[in-house]
Every structure is written in C-alpha cells, then in structure tokens.
C-alpha cells in the first residue's frame, strides 16, 4: 500500500548528510584539468594555493575520492536551515491540469535566500582553519555575496565583495544585507583594482559582468597577504559542497519510494544544478538508473545551447586559470536588460563534460517566459521565486504540459534555488511591459568566440 505523499517532506536533523558526494569519482571521462594560463600546463596544488585555501585546492583537484566527510562545525551550522524541504507542488499540478507529479527542493529558507550558503560556510570554515584574515569574492544578483558575508561573520573573517555593477544599482537592499553582516561591497568594474581600471577604459559605461568581478576579486586576493579568493559557482569544490542538495532530495524521495523521471535545474555557472543532480547522476554513470536531466539557461546567456566546448578564462581580465567548459568567450557581457540572473559566460567543467558526453540535455528560456512562469508559481505555491530558479520552473511546467498531452504520469523534480524578494525590479519591469527578450546574434557570439585562447583541447 502506497504512502500518502505530504505537501512537504522533511528529513530529521539527524538525517542531514555527513559527507559530500564527488560525482567526478564515477565519471569515466574526467573533467579536463585547469591550466596555467602562462605555461598551458595543468595546475598543481602549489600553483593554486596562492589563490584558494589549501584544503579547497585539494578538493578542487581530487577526481577520485567519492565522499568527503563534512566537518562537525559545518554540520552544526547547517542545522540552522537544513534539512530543507522537498515540496510536492500539488497546487501547481492542479492549475496545469497535468497527470505529472511535480516536486521541488526549496533552498530559500535562510537569510541569503538561496542555496549559496551551503558552500559559503564550507569555504569560510577552511579559510578560518588556515588562519587567514579574510576572503574576496564576486557576486551577481547578490545571493552568493550575502551567503559569504553571513559565513564570514560567523567565523570572524573579513569579506570583500565585488558586485556586478548592474545588480549593485538595481538591488541596493541585497547590498545592504551584505553590509549588515560586515562585508565591504564594491560595484564592479571599479577603479580600486588594476584590472577594473583597464576594463573601464576599454568599455566606458559598462554595466559589468561576473567575469569582470571575478578578475577584481582575484587581483585583490593575490595582492593582499592573508587573503584568498572564494567562488560561488563553477568550481569542482563548489559542486562538491552543493551535493548536499541532491543527497537530501534523494533521501526524501527514497522515504516514499519515489523514483523521479525528470530532474531539472537552472544553470548559470552550475552550482545548484550540479548539487541537485549529483547522486542521481552518480546512479546514471554507474548504470544503476536512468534519468532525464535538464539544464535550463537564459536565452540571453546560452553557454550550453549556443556556446563552444573549449578552454577559456573564467574571468574577463584573463588572470584566472583556464577551464575547459561550454563558453561564450570571457569577453561576453550579457545585455543590461537581462533581469533574470545566470549571467556567467561559461559553465562548470564537470557539467560541461557530462553534457558533452550525453548524460544530460539543455534548453534555454526567454526571460519574459521565465517571469510568466514565476508569477504562475507564486500564485499557486505561495512562494515568490528568484528569477534564476524560475528558469527551472519554466522547464518543469513545459514538461508537465507535455505529460498533459500524452497522459504520462511522470515524476518531475526541480530545484527552487531561492526567493525573489530582492528581485522585484525584474518583476516590476515584467508587469509594466518593459521587459525585453534580448537574444545575442550569431555575429555577437562569434566576437566572443574570437577571443578564445589558442589551447590544444
């Protein structure tokens, strides 16, 4: 006899995962190594150490260890907001009239409003353990910067945040939350760094990009003793920490004997998607199960769907290591009209390799469609979703409507990465009819590709 599925499935505190899962351990073809931009050779632990914390460098380079124990102090912090609920979207299902069963993993139940805290607290912990004075980082919409400022406040670390200029101006309240937690927040590009001044000279009036903010944060970290750079997405270590999302999701589904057919996540740099799909992808890689895994990205920043699989810089200033990923070119800057987040030009090397090898697929969505889906979800499910999360909502709705046509009773799981209460400018533009769907032309993309470094893949 099947159990009745509650609206929210909660794990017990004692069921919080005590190890992170490293999906690379099950990948037959490993992600290509990070390269030293000067020599073109794979980066060593010693070369990475001036940029990242020592323990995080080890996590970054380890392709073989399947599980990393989560330190007790991090588990203790996780208990403030974890386990997060897995929610059955009964009201959305009813509104769509679909036979599909829809679930979402809600990661917005903390002050940062998103999943970003899962990795922020881990990276701050290792920085504190190493005896560092502080860390530097970039942030786009502000969720990562907020999460890191919280984590740094908890461990008594300095936190310097370079925030993409367009978001700095559009989201002043997110900036203020960071300042509440003691962070020093600077609009990027800025005149406080060498690379920032260079970009301002090259592109007067630019609204910035994540690639630009990364360059500034890295420069400050390497030039100031006692500081290291930390990143909220893209890196292997970040996807490792975020695996807690997928591990909890799978544990909650297993409690009720539920096997998903489709797993959907929004994709900018890949932290949420990589974390959500981790244990399911592991099963797929080991041949134990099969899932339809879908990455959803903005049509205005289409790394997977229109990008190239090549070595590229992770930053606009071209000072970071080279990563083999799906990329639009490190010089690509999304339109200032793009309100939906997910503005990074590249993608996680892990997800890039998995996509290249056919283990997952990708779709893109126009931001007007994304906000339409977001408002339907808000009306049905009672939570105002972040624009980033709403890309996954859009794809989940599309898949559910396909089931309505075919009569299939598929089980769909997606990641609700966070809340949209600081993203009301985008909602305002949508409701006022001022939101435009910017889609880069082939010619614009070719300009970005022309700047790709000449590296033997």
Where are these regions (language model features)?
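Active-site/ligand-binding loops adjacent to catalytic centers
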Residues: 67-69, 199-237, 245, 257, ...
């Amino acid at each position: 006899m099947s159990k009745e599925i509650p609206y929210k499935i909660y794990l017990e505190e004692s069921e919080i995962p005590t190890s992170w899962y490293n999906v690379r351990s099950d990948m037959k073809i490993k992600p290509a190594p990070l390269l030293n931009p000067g020599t073109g050779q794979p980066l060593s632990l010693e070369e990475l150490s001036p940029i990242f914390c020592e323990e995080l460098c080890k996590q970054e380079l380890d392709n073989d260890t399947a599980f990393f124990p989560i330190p007790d102090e991090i588990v203790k912090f996780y208990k403030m907001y974890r386990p997060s609920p897995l929610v059955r979207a009964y009201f959305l299902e009813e509104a769509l009239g679909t036979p599909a069963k829809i679930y979402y993993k809600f990661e917005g139940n903390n002050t940062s409003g998103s999943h970003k805290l899962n990795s922020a607290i881990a990276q701050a912990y290792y920085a504190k353990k190493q005896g560092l004075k502080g860390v530097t980082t970039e942030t786009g919409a502000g969720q990562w910067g907020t999460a890191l400022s919280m984590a740094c406040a908890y461990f008594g670390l300095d936190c310097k945040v370079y925030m993409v200029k367009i978001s700095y101006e559009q989201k002043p309240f997110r900036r203020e939350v960071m300042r509440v937690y003691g962070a020093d927040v600077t609009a990027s590009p800025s005149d406080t760094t060498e690379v920032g001044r260079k970009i301002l000279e090259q592109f007067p009036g630019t609204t910035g990009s994540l690639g630009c903010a990364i360059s500034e944060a890295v420069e400050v970290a390497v030039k100031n003793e006692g500081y290291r750079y930390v990143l909220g997405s893209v890196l292997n270590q970040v996807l490792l920490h975020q695996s807690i999302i997928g591990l909890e999701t799978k544990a909650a589904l297993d409690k009720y004997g539920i096997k998903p057919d489709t797993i959907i996540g929004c994709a900018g740099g890949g932290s949420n998607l990589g974390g959500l799909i981790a244990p399911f992808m592991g099963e797929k890689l080991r041949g134990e199960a099969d899932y339809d895994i879908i990455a959803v990205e903005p049509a205005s920043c289409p790394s997977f769907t229109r990008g190239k699989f090549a070595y590229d810089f992770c930053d606009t200033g071209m000072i970071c290591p080279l990563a083999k990923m799906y990329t639009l070119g490190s010089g690509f800057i999304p339109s200032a009209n793009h309100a939906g987040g997910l503005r990074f030009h590249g993608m996680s090397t892990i997800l890039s390799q998995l996509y290249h090898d056919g283990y997952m697929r990708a779709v893109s969505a126009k931001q007007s469609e994304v906000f339409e889906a977001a408002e339907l979800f808000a009306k049905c499910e009672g939570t105002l979703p972040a624009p980033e999360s709403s890309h996954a909502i859009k794809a989940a709705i599309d898949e559910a409507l396909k089931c309505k046509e075919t009569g299939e009773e598929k089980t769909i799981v997606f990641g609700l990465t966070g809340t949209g209460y600081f993203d009301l400018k985008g909602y305002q533009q949508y409701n006022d009819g001022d939101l435009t769907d910017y889609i880069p032309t082939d010619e614009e993309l070719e300009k970005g590709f022309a700047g790709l470094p000449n590296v033997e893949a």
